[in-house]
Amino acid sequence: MTNQQAPQTSETVAVVWLKRDLRLRDHEPLVRAAASGYPVLLLYIIEPILLGDPHYSARHWQFIRQSIEDINTQLAPFETQVQVIFDEATKALQRLSQWLTIQAVYSHQEIGLANTYDRDRQIRQWCHNQHIAWHESATGAVIRGLTHRRQWSKHWERVYRHQCYDVALNTIK
C-alpha cells in the first residue's frame, strides 16, 4: 500500500499458518483454530529466506503448489481457500493485521533449519508486541531445544498413540 490508509479492521480471525504440513487431516493447529469460534483464515507464506535455501528445490516448490491446489479443491464447497502471500513472515502478518483483527495464530512448530528457527523467534516477538497469541503444535515427536533424551520415549509414545486431529471442513468459516 502506498499513500493509502488501511481500512478499519472489520473482522476478527484465527490464522492457521501453514508451513510444511500441507493437509487438512490430522492437523492440530487447524482443529484448535476452528474450535476458537472465530472465522479461520488459512495462510501460506512464500518466504524469500526459503526461496534460495538449498533445502528447497524446484520439486519442493512444485509439491507446495500442488498441495495448496489440492487443499483449495477440498475447501471449494465451503467457499474458502488458502491465502498465499509472498513476503517475509512478519511483514505478511503485519499486512494482514492492517485489514483484519488477528485473534491468534496457529501453526505447527517447525524444526530443522536455523533460518526458520530465527524467523520463528521474530514471529514470537511480533506476536508478543501485537498482543496476539501464537499457538504452536508439536511436529511429530520432536521436541525443539531438547538438551537430553530422558523423557523423549514417553513423549513419543504419547504423541503416536494420540488420535488424529480432524476437523469438519464445514466448521471452517
Residue spans of the language-model regions?
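Active-site "lid/cap" and pocket-lining segments within catalytic core domains
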Residues: T2-K173
